[in-house]
């Protein structure tokens, strides 16, 4: 496998997060297999990648806080809570379906 290889994954945003991503709820992405330091791609790298390459809204603080998904955002990896998968240390796999759901709603 070459260093420029990618992993096909599906990303979804819900609960209002799609507003930060050009009002698009679903993305089919080709994520690089390695992060900036040459390590296998993890959810932490995916979050950075989304902020740097996909998010057009300048309000990144509504999605991330201290380099991780901010509290109040549920992350599902293949329909399972990311806490069961190792949270942001989970290594992204081919055809993963990763969903970010805001559980915070205005009144």
Swiss-Prot record:
Keywords: Cytoplasm, Isopeptide bond, tRNA processing, Ubl conjugation pathway. The keyword Mitochondrion does not apply. It comes from the Eukaryota. SUPFAM superfamilies: MoaD/ThiS (SSF54285). The modification 1-thioglycine is found at residue 107. One of its GO terms (cellular component) is cytosol. GO terms for biological process: protein urmylation; tRNA thio-modification; tRNA wobble uridine modification. InterPro entries: Beta-grasp_dom_sf, Mopterin_synth/thiamin_S_b, Urm1. It is found in: Cytoplasm. Pathway: tRNA modification; 5-methoxycarbonylmethyl-2-thiouridine-tRNA biosynthesis. C-terminal thiocarboxylation occurs in 2 steps, it is first acyl-adenylated (-COAMP) via the hesA/moeB/thiF part of UBA4, then thiocarboxylated (-COSH) via the rhodanese domain of UBA4. The keyword tRNA processing applies. Transmembrane segments: none annotated. Belongs to the URM1 family. Acts as a sulfur carrier required for 2-thiolation of mcm(5)S(2)U at tRNA wobble positions of cytosolic tRNA(Lys), tRNA(Glu) and tRNA(Gln). Serves as sulfur donor in tRNA 2-thiolation reaction by being thiocarboxylated (-COSH) at its C-terminus by the MOCS3 homolog UBA4. The sulfur is then transferred to tRNA to form 2-thiolation of mcm(5)S(2)U. Prior mcm(5) tRNA modification by the elongator complex is required for 2-thiolation. Also acts as a ubiquitin-like protein (UBL) that is covalently conjugated via an isopeptide bond to lysine residues of target proteins such as AHP1. This is Ubiquitin-related modifier 1. The gene is urm1.
């Amino acid at each position: 496998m070459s260093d420029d290889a990618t992993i096909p994954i599906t990303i979804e945003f819900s609960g209002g997060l799609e507003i930060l991503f050009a009002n698009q709820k679903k993305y089919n992405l080709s994520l690089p297999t390695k992060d900036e330091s040459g390590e296998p791609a993890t959810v932490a790298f995916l979050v950075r990648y989304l902020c740097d390459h996909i998010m057009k809204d300048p309000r990144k603080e509504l999605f991330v806080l201290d380099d991780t998904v901010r509290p109040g955002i549920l992350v599902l990896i293949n329909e399972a809570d990311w806490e069961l998968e190792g949270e942001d240390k989970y290594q992204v796999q081919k055809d993963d379906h990763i969903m970010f759901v805001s559980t915070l709603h205005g009144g």
